[in-house]
Curated annotation (Swiss-Prot):
This is Extended FMRFamide-3. Keywords: Amidation, Neuropeptide, Secreted. The lineage of its organism: Eukaryota, Metazoa, Ecdysozoa, Arthropoda, Hexapoda. Coiled coil: none annotated. It is found in: Secreted. One of its GO terms (biological process) is neuropeptide signaling pathway.
């Protein structure tokens, strides 16, 4: 989900 993108940062 979108939250994964934040962790990928």
């Amino acid at each position: 989900g979108p939250e994964t993108a934040f962790f990928r940062l």
